[in-house]
Amino acid sequence: MENTQKNIEKNLQSSKKHSYNLHSPGVRTYKDSVFCRIFNEKKELLSLYNALNMSHYENPDDLEIITLDNALFLQMKNDVAFLINTNEMCLIEHSSTVCLNYPLRSLLYLAREYEVILEQRNENILKYGLVKIPTPACIVLYNGIEKRPEVEILKLSDAFENQEVEPCLELFVKVLNINDGMNENVLNGCKTLKDYVILISKIRENYNEIGDLAKAIHKAVDYCIDADHLRSFLIRNR
């Protein structure tokens, strides 16, 4: 059963690399994950940000999506990156596994983002005055089958080979478990995220019953449309 579940996750998560069609067979390549497609819209992304931070931003134009081109940056791929009010940079990744290298990947990703931002702002880091940069936040939304805590903090310093020396650099990645019963304040604060979790849960449930991924997706999509979970998105993409 565990191996079967892992195969489901592998098929579902393969959508992060390939073109997306809700009723494509599992072998068909996908371009973007469902998650990326949903939260590539500023309105939905702002709702997610507000839920994660208990904030109340209302204007989607306060947000600027700055996700790097995956074709150029495959090793540091992130689902979505954005600026809020130009002074905070948020990296969000959705995953069915918890990768202990998230902090290192985030460090490299942030460095590239800062390089782009400084170039766009025509900043010179060799000048005497302090160059200000957006404050970073790195978040992973986890909904895999492995039991994990509600909240985990992964640290870059755990990767340092010499643990006896106090490091001059640190980076934290917050991992939020969004499975049923976990972080309900976040899910209740963002209906779209909650609907997405329901969709994935239904696909898993259906796959366990019928053993066919394409049919499992089809059945889950029909259910979610009827129940008004991601209805507009699913109708557009079915």
Model-derived regions, located:
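Elongated, amphipathic alpha-helical interaction scaffolds
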Residues: 2-238
